C-alpha cells in the first residue's frame, strides 16, 4: 500500500496521493461495510457512506480515519454500540488508546463512552471477541 501510493517516497500520503489510495483500498471496503459494526440497542444498523477520509503512515502502520454520519438521535435508554473488526481476517483494527471515540453532543445533555468486549458477538468459533464502544446519552 505504501509502496504503491506514497509516490514521492516522503513517508506520508499527500493530497495528490490520497485519491488513488482511497479508490484502490478504502472504497473497496464498502462490500464489508468498512469493517464498521453498528448496533442501536439490539438492532444491527447499516453503515452509511463514510466522509472525510484521510490516511496516514506512522510506525510502519497505515491508518485510515473517516467520519460515519449516522444522523441518529439517541435516547437515554438505548445505547449505540460501535466496533471495527474484520471477521474475514485480512486486517487487524484496534481502538486508539488515547481518545478512541470522539463525541459531539448537539442537543444538550451528556454523552459517555465505555469500551467493552462483546462475547455474544464473537466469531471464528468464539476465539475472537470484538471490542465495542458503547455510547450512551443522558439529558444532564
Curated annotation (Swiss-Prot):
<dbReference type="InterPro" id="IPR010412">
    <property type="entry name" value="DUF1007"/>
</dbReference>
<protein>
    <recommendedName>
        <fullName>Uncharacterized 15.5 kDa protein in trpE 3'region</fullName>
    </recommendedName>
</protein>
<dbReference type="Pfam" id="PF06226">
    <property type="entry name" value="DUF1007"/>
</dbReference>
